[in-house]
Swiss-Prot record:
One of several proteins that assist in the late maturation steps of the functional core of the 30S ribosomal subunit. Helps release RbfA from mature subunits. May play a role in the assembly of ribosomal proteins into the subunit. Circularly permuted GTPase that catalyzes slow GTP hydrolysis, GTPase activity is stimulated by the 30S ribosomal subunit. Its EC number is 3.6.1.-. Belongs to the TRAFAC class YlqF/YawG GTPase family. RsgA subfamily. This is Small ribosomal subunit biogenesis GTPase RsgA. It comes from Photorhabdus laumondii subsp. laumondii (strain DSM 15139 / CIP 105565 / TT01). PROSITE patterns: ENGC_GTPASE, G_CP.
Amino acid sequence: MAKHKLSKGQQRRVRENHQRRLKKQDNKPEMDDNQLGEPQEGLVISRFGQHADVEAEDGSTQRCNIRRTIRSLVTGDRVVWRPSLQTQADVKVNGIVEAVHERTSVLTRPDYYDGIKPIAANIDQIVIVSAILPELSLNIIDRYLVACETLGIEPLIVLNKIDLLDEESRAWVNEIMSTYHNIGYRVLKLSSHTGEGMEELTKMLAGRITIFAGQSGVGKSSLLNTLLPEDEEEILVNQVSDVSGLGQHTTTASRLYHFPHGGDVIDSPGVREFGLWHLTSEQVTQGFVEFRDYLGGCKFRDCKHRDDPACALRKAVEDNEINQERFENYHRILDSMDQIKPRKTFTDNDS
């Protein structure tokens, strides 16, 4: 059934009601200083509207209000919070977040209408999970790598389900993955079913905050259920996010989980995909790390690296210095960006 478009009058009333709700929220009194204990360090485990779950220094999780002066708060933020000395009658709140430490990185999601939204903070690495089944898509891997380069977050390419490969197929996969290894990316081949490669993955996760990304069906849930404690496995059966946008998600808030052997993972269902359509063509070009040595070497400054004469990138492809399929995926990404025009112009201030 088609949805009726709201009239201008209905749209105005929706906006007015929204503003009234915001004003009502703003009029709610915050906790007085005499109701609060001493400042403590904490880690945001999850964010729910005007509240956040904060992990205290003793390992306990405390539901906290958020100071109105805090402009942005997301899962993974390191904060200063103060415990409540009194319990509010209407909401079980144990404290208030007073300040947010400077972030080392921020994972953002481009929104078609509202600009760039922060989803998680202080991410150390993004694990790009792929598999030979349902399909080994190098185009999707390359899209994730461009996103990682733009965000400044280190990627780790993980090829799952290698137990399904025979000797000949393994040789073929090794040749494909060598392309990424040769340009400086970490590549790990494993099987969450047989356990092959899992010990090495555990070591690479230790001491770091990680996001798992990958198209539907590559085994992200199986990997996380193998890595996480049993009491958190059931949570992730339905909660693990599909960052590729090719599958469904059921959770509404990002959440941080601890690996028993060290390190953390943030499940971010708010990110269906690493949308690239908000990037400039120059940012996408810079996202292909092996291109960088050749940029500026083209005959024309506005070279599109297609049929332009004396193109340094195309010459590098012809000389086998740049992988042909990576070069083709680069143009596929640019072509896909031209098909989507956001309602909002993106600026650095959006993040």
